[in-house]
Design a protein with these regions (language model features):
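Short linear sequence motifs
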Residues: 42, 134-135
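Short, well-ordered alpha-helical microsegments
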Residues: 55-58, 142, 167
Length: 192
């Protein structure tokens, strides 16, 4: 078992063990940090995620973004699982969501945008380190979709995490995406 596989397993088990109360408190605190940091959201198109498996909830942040008149988009995974490049569909309401093969809610009948059109990308993660690297679920969708755009720095990559998801190193590889910041219940980590 590789270090990444072992770390992923450990952090997922830890995340799975948190209570509903802990998860709700994490959402409240994370959302407060987000709203205090992004008081005037300069981004028109924001990618958000639908949380699964006890990922940090995004409902409050999504509502805030929409109240500011901005558009939220959800990742859309291609039915051909060999195609790792995600597209993004506009999120209008919960009723429009359909679960994909990974049990992730997607908005299927909404306008699509490609990754380069997004200005703020809010991502789930399994772990993150001091340098801003993230460890995801292991499929590489975010890495593959955004790696080429990261070089132009027109997009901001933001992770949402629990404090226990911070680790010394995610042992990044060349293809791994680096985030600009991570928001946790206790505060914000910014990376240069």
């Amino acid at each position: 078992m590789t270090y990444k596989t072992s770390l992923r397993k450990e952090k997922i088990q830890e995340r799975d063990s948190i209570s509903t109360k802990e998860r709700d408190l994490a959402e409240k605190n994370t959302a407060e940090h987000f709203m205090n940091t992004y008081t005037e959201l300069d981004f028109e198109k924001v990618s958000i995620y639908s949380p699964i498996k006890n990922e940090v909830p995004t409902e409050t942040i999504t509502r805030y973004i929409k109240e500011l008149g901005k558009k939220c988009f959800l990742p859309l995974i291609d039915k051909n699982l060999n195609n790792k490049e995600m597209k993004f569909s506009e999120f209008t309401n919960e009723a429009s969501l359909v679960k994909n093969k990974f049990n992730i809610p997607e908005s299927l009948n909404s306008p699509l945008v490609i990754a380069s059109e997004l200005e703020l990308v809010i991502m789930p993660l399994v772990a993150f380190d001091n340098k801003g690297y993230r460890l995801g679920m292991g499929q590489g969708y975010y890495d593959f979709t955004f790696k080429n755009f990261q070089l132009n720095k027109k997009q901001v990559f933001l992770g949402l995490a629990y404090d226990f998801q911070k680790t010394e190193s995610c042992y990044p590889e060349e293809h791994d995406l680096k985030m600009d910041a991570v928001i946790c219940p206790s505060g914000i980590y910014k990376f240069s």
